[in-house]
Amino acid sequence: MKKLTKTNSHRQQKLASIINEALIEILRRGKMLDSRLFNCPLTITKVIVTADLKIANCYFLPFNTKLTINEVMNALNNSKKAIRNFITNKINVKFSPDIRFHYDHGFDNAIKVEELLKNIQVLGDKLNH
């Protein structure tokens, strides 16, 4: 019987962890990055590496920034070469994975779910009175 869920291999998880740590370090240092990222606090929420280890999907969440999501995405993409070089020096693999940045919608979705639950509770309270 086939598994319904796909699990990441140990190599995928280890590489994702190393990339996550390297991203945090280079973003903290700020060297070689697009200048728009200097005053833009970012959290790398997760890194998912494909099974062939060729692509690393990196999810981010900006905090307290005047930049739009697209501006942050463009700044990260402009810094991609420097980020990839930095990561290449941190990992020991034949080929460095292509880094792809994605906005993490998880926080926004959690807020929406919380609002929906509050609305349901308010409606339930109105029906009970």
From Swiss-Prot:
PROSITE patterns referenced in this protein's UniProt entry, alphabetically: RBFA
Top-level taxon of origin: Bacteria
Localization annotation: Cytoplasm
Record-level GO BP terms: maturation of SSU-rRNA
Record keywords, A-Z: Cytoplasm, Ribosome biogenesis
Any matching Pfam family: RBFA
GO cellular component, one term: cytosol
InterPro entries assigned to the protein according to its UniProt record, in alphabetical order: KH_dom-like_a/b, RbfA, RbfA_dom_sf, Ribosome-bd_factorA_CS
Record keyword Oxidoreductase present: no
One Gene Ontology molecular-function label: ribosomal small subunit binding
Entry-linked PANTHER family: RIBOSOME-BINDING FACTOR A, CHLOROPLASTIC-RELATED
HAMAP family, per the entry: RbfA
Subunit structure: Monomer. Binds 30S ribosomal subunits, but not 50S ribosomal subunits or 70S ribosomes.
Protein family (similarity comment): Belongs to the RbfA family.
Biological role stated in the UniProt entry: One of several proteins that assist in the late maturation steps of the functional core of the 30S ribosomal subunit. Associates with free 30S ribosomal subunits (but not with 30S subunits that are part of 70S ribosomes or polysomes). Required for efficient processing of 16S rRNA. May interact with the 5'-terminal helix region of 16S rRNA.
Name this protein carries in UniProt: Ribosome-binding factor A
Primary gene name: rbfA
